[in-house]
């Protein structure tokens, strides 16, 4: 493995495990470095299968709380890009509606946890480094909309980071 200021290169390998520990000093200006080093050290002490298993269990503890079955459709077997194109012509795809519902839950689950910051205006789904409005927190409808699904999709605790942010 070779690392430079702008790249990481892996050659002649069948696999590579790259561990990254990222965070913010939004709440703790002095302790973020130790916090990140602790999490990286914990991750380094585990093999990939353990890390994956622990991540999957944590994710599924939230995601598996809800299932939504709106019925089977003729397009259930299609790749998503074909389904979306077909949906533009004919809205009769109950499975796509259920998939979209679960995608919204996935975005919220993936963007926050108790004790962390809530998703910002762009969340983690922005496709650029320089986000519109700098990905700021504005306590208006835009930030609130990120949290609308929390209660109705059985992810109540995921709106708590927003409450904590507004308290501070």
Q: Which residues are covered by each model-predicted region?
A:
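Well-ordered alpha-helical segments within folded domains of soluble proteins
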Residues: 141-151
């Amino acid at each position: 493995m070779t690392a430079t200021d702008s790249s990481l290169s892996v050659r002649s390998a069948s696999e590579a495990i790259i561990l990254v520990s990222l965070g913010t000093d939004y709440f703790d200006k002095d302790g973020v470095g130790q916090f990140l080093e602790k999490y990286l050290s914990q991750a380094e002490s585990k093999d990939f299968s353990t890390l994956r298993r622990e991540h999957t269990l944590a994710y599924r503890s939230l995601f598996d709380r809800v299932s939504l079955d709106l019925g089977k459709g003729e397009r259930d077997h299609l790749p998503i890009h074909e389904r979306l194109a077909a949906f533009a012509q004919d809205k009769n795809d109950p499975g796509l509606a259920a998939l979209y519902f679960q995608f919204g839950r996935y975005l919220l689950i993936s963007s926050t946890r108790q004790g962390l910051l809530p998703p910002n205006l762009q969340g983690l789904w922005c496709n650029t480094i320089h986000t519109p409005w700098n990905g700021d927190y504005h306590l208006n409808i835009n930030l609130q909309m990120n949290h609308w699904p929390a209660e109705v999709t059985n992810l109540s605790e995921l709106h708590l980071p927003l409450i904590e942010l507004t308290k501070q």
